[in-house]
Amino acid sequence: MNGIINLKKEAGMTSHDAVFKLRKILGTKKIGHGGTLDPDVVGVLPIAVGKATRMVEFMQDEGKIYEGEIILGYSTTTEDASGEVVAETPVLSSLDEKLVDEAIASLTGPITQIPPMYSAVKVNGRKLYEYARAGQEVERPERQVIIYQFERTSPISYDGQLARFTFRVKCSKGTYIRTLSVDLGEKLGYAAHMSHLTRTSAAGLQLEDALALEEIAEKVEAGQLDFLHPLEIGTGDLVKVFLTPEEATEVRFGRFIELDQTDKELAAFEDDKLLAILEKRGNLYKPRKVFS
């Protein structure tokens, strides 16, 4: 069994939980996921099965799209709704929506983030959330991410001394939307957190086409495997090249080939089938992963 599954992950489930359950449903151990989702986040979790597990790193590289809500007025230990309140800054008057949108725009493009303490990023061999649960604060490494698009998608509404609005973000891998929400609050002068989040797109897969675990289990029981997408969709943003029969033969034997390309990595096709991932070495391309 080989292919890519567009899984709709439910709230309360870790990405590891999803993989574990799918191994039981599909009866195979060779399964991986293409980008971790926090337990409280719902939405698209790309799953690689069989040969497709060799595509995971490329599936993770493609941009992701999220929709969620930001609340101004208080911040939490986890930067989302699951944590304890750590700071409060009441919103006592209406916000200027133009100024809010300008602050949002200032957080697009390449930005620097500091991962939240409640995250799986490792420092000195331990995950940050392990330090956090032990009540320890440690220095966290900065990381560079790219925010391709960040926009407010609703009017600002008010609930007592809180302000809230929904948003949409397209970003690179490694981006913490929780942290982006907190950083926006800081720019506006308020403590803030992310109240909920949905991933609507990842690895070229869309939420409207995603299937829940129960739906996949029903299809397997009925002998239907149409939920398995071909490996080709896992190439993500890699530039695609179509090889001649002679070039394809060389690639199958693991030999270098010459191509008029400049990209570091290429997805090489023979007809409409993915043959290999090629890696640039000097003026030539070397097969990095061969699939057939």
Swiss-Prot record:
InterPro entries, per database record: PsdUridine_synth_cat_dom_sf, PsdUridine_synth_N, tRNA_psdUridine_synth_TruB, TruB_C
Family matches, as Gene3D superfamilies: Pseudouridine synthase (3.30.2350.10)
MF (Gene Ontology): pseudouridine synthase activity; RNA binding; tRNA pseudouridine(55) synthase activity
Catalysed reactions, as listed in the record: uridine(55) in tRNA = pseudouridine(55) in tRNA
SUPFAM superfamilies, alphabetized: Pseudouridine synthase (SSF55120)
Keyword entries, A-Z: Isomerase, tRNA processing
One Pfam family from the record: TruB_N
Active site: 38 (nucleophile)
EC number(s) stated in the UniProt entry for this protein: 5.4.99.25
Enzyme class: isomerase
Gene Ontology BP, a term: tRNA pseudouridine synthesis
Domain of life, source organism: Bacteria
PANTHER family (UniProt xref): PSEUDOURIDYLATE SYNTHASE TRUB1, TRNA-PSEUDOURIDINE SYNTHASE
Family: Belongs to the pseudouridine synthase TruB family. Type 1 subfamily.
Family matches, as NCBIfam families: TruB
HAMAP family: TruB_bact
Name under which the protein is recorded: tRNA pseudouridine synthase B
Species of provenance: Streptococcus pneumoniae (strain ATCC BAA-255 / R6)
